Amino acid sequence: MSQKQYRVAMIGAGKIVQVGHIPNFQSLTNVTVEALCDVNEERVKAIAKEKAIPRTFTDYKKMLSEVKPDITVIATPNVFHKPMALEALAAGSHVLCEKPLALSYADAKEMMDLATSKGLTLTVGSHYRWSDAIRAAKAQADAGFFGEIYAVRTVWHRRSGIPGYGSWFTRKDLAGGGSLLDIGIHALDRALFLMGYPQPLTVSGATFSKLGPQGLGLGGWGADILKPTSNTQFD
């Protein structure tokens, strides 16, 4: 029996799309990447040419209307996730949205409700849960190796300063928040994933800005990205 073929369109042509989504989707035998959309026309055309993607757009609504993709990847500044996902779902497309799914619970629920009502999949790019370390820890947790897990503390160590200073990642009007929405969401996902996504009884959190202003614009994102290790701690 032949595999079902899926046509993919992507909104956003940043680094995660270039080094992650495009090559990984193109490696699948039953998937074709049909179109790429970005507001930077020069960049999107150059990337599409390099990656052998046949069509480019600067208007995602036009892309959804003309391409009619089976799957839409959304990798744009966080503030645009909700409207773009709703448009893609309304057009009948499954959606893979970069984290965070939305900027509020109410917005996320609206997106999930629409996906459910249309029988479509809406998923989030929480890729750290698929790392070798987390998958091994999950297998051990499911096998009962840790006993009853009733509390988890998850920690993310990162250098001081603000890597990428000046980009949309550091602009609240586009990112919707700070480090909690950016890297904190991965830490929370790891903890909840390892525990089987229980319903939390209490939640507390804190963020600190004391270290942030040091070393403005110094270097890149650091060496923690995509390392096959986990800082999740079980207390």
Residue spans for each PLM region:
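Conserved G/P- and acidic residue-centered "switch" motifs that form tight phosphate/ATP-binding loops
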Residues: 12, 99, 144
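Acidic-histidine catalytic/liganding microenvironments
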Residues: 28, 51, 66, 131, ...
